[in-house]
Every structure is written in structure tokens, then in C-alpha cells.
Design a protein with these regions (language model features):
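Short, glycine-/small- and polar/acidic-enriched structural segments
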Residues: 1-131, 156, 175-179
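Positions that flank functional sites
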Residues: 38, 67, 165, 183, ...
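Proline/Glycine/Serine-rich low-complexity intrinsically disordered segments
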Residues: 95-99, 126, 133, 190-197, ...
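Structural motif
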Residues: 112, 137-141
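Pocket-lining segment of extracytoplasmic ligand-binding domains
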Residues: 142-224
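Secondary-structure end/capping motifs
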Residues: 194-268
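Conserved C-terminal helix/tail region of periplasmic/extracytoplasmic solute-binding proteins
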Residues: 262-294
């Protein structure tokens, strides 16, 4: 039987579950595989593009908006049993004159195209600016790519999450506005449903460990961080980042999110799929006779 292929996606959970042996305890035969070979991606290439190309994994993550549309297009199945919350923010250099969200009017903000930073930056800034005054740049790479350009002062502002969020804080970069957003999981290929359950049971245990003693686990950020910065990052100062919420991603949330994306024309009209929850999503919730390991 083929291995269950997992993409960690810049968070702590998979690394904690591996180190603690939680996948092994479940009897899961797995391997980790990166979705993105480089973060210096071309203009308008982001999370959705990777789903269109075809992710060589059985389970991976992205923002819930992109997973919503990708699943609606038949590019995989959105897991409806849980979601996660990722701290995020728009950062500027410490010497920048930009101090308030309204100061971002007309300023190019580096985000990933059709990725979490794209949607969440719009969602946050619409409270302050009309849409025509929000200027997003899609040409600066995905997460680590745009972080590096911000640090090198090649871009005036960038949306960051996960380790780069905490590294920017460590370096004294200023968060102008919070852009915390929801993540979701996508199943691709044809994984065994029981393997998927094993995976999420292991992540549930890892989440508890991270909640209890985050300082023991933030070192795992280094495993996906660019080599250039490994001598500079101090993960002891960083927070736990993304948190998995084992509550349903409901039909109402799915439909509201699909409508929100369509209203902002983030995708060309007619290219988002049918937006039917029952076709796009799958529930693999534990049966009542199953128990999470202690």
C-alpha cells in the first residue's frame, strides 16, 4: 500500500506529531512532502495555482477560501470536520512612515495570489479603505519569498503568517493591521479514509501538546525556514502560530465564504465551480465507538 503523503504547511503540528510518535502510534505509514519547491514564485502564482497543477500529497492545507474554491472545482475534497486559525498581519519596516491602516492607501502590499494573505488582507483593510484604494502586489513570491523581500527593503509592506510573522516581530518590523484567518485541509488523490482519521487523531494530540507547552515546540519552525536566516531566528521568542479547531466547517460557513469570494471577483466570473457544499466537502468524523488516544 502507498504511503500517506502529508504536506506540513509551515506549522508545528505535523512536526510535533512525528517527534512524539503520534503517527506511529496510529499505525500510519506516511511521508512528508513539500508542495512548493521554491517561494520565489512568478507573478500571480499562489496556493490555488498549486491545486490546479495538482498537489502530490494526500492531505495538505491552505486558507479556507482557496480550499473552498478548489474543492468546488473538483480539485480535491475539503475536510469539513475541522479548520484552523492562523495569526497573520501586514508588516512594514520599523523606519516606515506607515503607522495606521489608513496609511496603506495606494501602497503595494505583497501577498500571495489567491492565497490566504490575498483574501485576509482585503478582509482586514476593507474596514478602513474602499476596495479601489487597496493595492495588492502578487509579484513578490509566496510566504518566505515576500518575507525576504520585506527584510531586504525591496517591498514597502507584506502580509505574513506563521514563522515569518514572528520573525518580523523579532526584527522590530511593525504590524499595521492584524489579518488572522481560517485555514482548511484538502484531500487529494484517493487516500484511505482510515488513514485520514489516523492523521487527524495524531494532530489532535499534537495540538494539546502545543497548547500546554508551546515553548517546547516552537523550535520546529526552523525545519521549514530559509537557510539564510537560521543563524538569526530565535524561536524561543515566538508563539505557537496556527491552531487547529476540531469543530465543523459548516455548510453556512462554506456558502458565506464562497459568496464573499465571488463578490470581490478574486476569480474570473464563472471559474469558481458550483459552490455546492455536499459535492466539495467530506466528513470523516470519528464513529461514536472510536476514542482519541490519551
Amino acid at each position: 500500500m502507498a504511503k500517506f503523503v502529508i504536506s506540513p504547511h509551515f506549522r508545528l503540528h505535523e512536526w510535533v506529531a512525528e517527534e512524539k510518535g503520534y503517527f506511529r502510534d496510529e499505525g500510519l505509514d506516511y511521508e512528508f512532502r513539500d508542495v512548493f519547491k521554491t517561494h520565489a514564485t512568478p507573478d500571480r502564482v499562489g496556493a490555488y495555482t498549486s491545486f490546479e497543477k495538482g498537489r502530490e500529497t494526500n492531505v495538505s492545507c491552505a486558507c479556507h477560501w482557496t480550499v473552498n474554491v478548489a474543492a468546488s472545482q473538483g480539485l480535491g475534497k475539503m475536510v469539513a470536520d475541522c479548520y484552523s486559525i492562523s495569526p497573520g498581519g501586514v508588516f512594514v519596516p520599523p523606519e516606515s512612515p506607515i503607522r495606521e491602516p489608513k496609511d496603506l492607501k495606494g501602497v503595494p502590499i505583497s501577498v500571495g495570489h489567491q492565497s490566504g494573505s490575498h483574501y485576509s488582507t482585503l478582509q482586514a483593510l476593507e474596514q478602513y479603505l474602499p476596495r479601489e484604494d487597496i493595492k495588492l502586489s502578487f509579484a513578490d513570491g509566496i510566504l518566505f519569498g515576500r518575507m525576504e523581500k520585506l527584510i531586504d527593503r525591496q517591498v514597502p509592506a507584506a502580509a505574513l503568517f506563521s514563522g515569518p510573522y514572528y520573525f518580523a516581530e523579532q526584527l522590530g518590523f511593525r504590524k499595521v493591521i492584524d489579518t488572522t484567518f481560517m485555514m482548511a485541509s484538502m484531500l487529494t488523490g484517493d487516500p484511505d479514509p482510515e488513514d485520514v482519521r489516523k492523521y487527524f487523531r495524531a494532530l489532535r494530540r499534537a495540538q494539546r501538546d502545543i497548547d500546554l507547552r508551546p515553548e517546547l515546540h516552537t523550535r520546529h519552525y526552523a525545519k521549514e525556514f530559509p537557510q539564510r536566516f537560521l543563524g538569526e531566528i530565535d524561536t524561543r521568542r515566538w508563539g505557537p502560530g496556527e491552531r487547529i479547531v476540531f469543530e465543523p466547517y459548516t455548510r453556512e460557513v462554506f456558502e458565506e465564504s464562497f459568496k464573499w469570494i465571488a463578490e470581490r471577483e478574486i476569480f474570473e466570473p464563472g471559474t469558481m465551480g458550483a459552490g455546492r457544499f455536499e459535492e466539495a466537502c467530506i466528513s470523516l468524523a470519528q464513529r461514536s465507538d472510536e476514542r482519541t488516544p490519551a
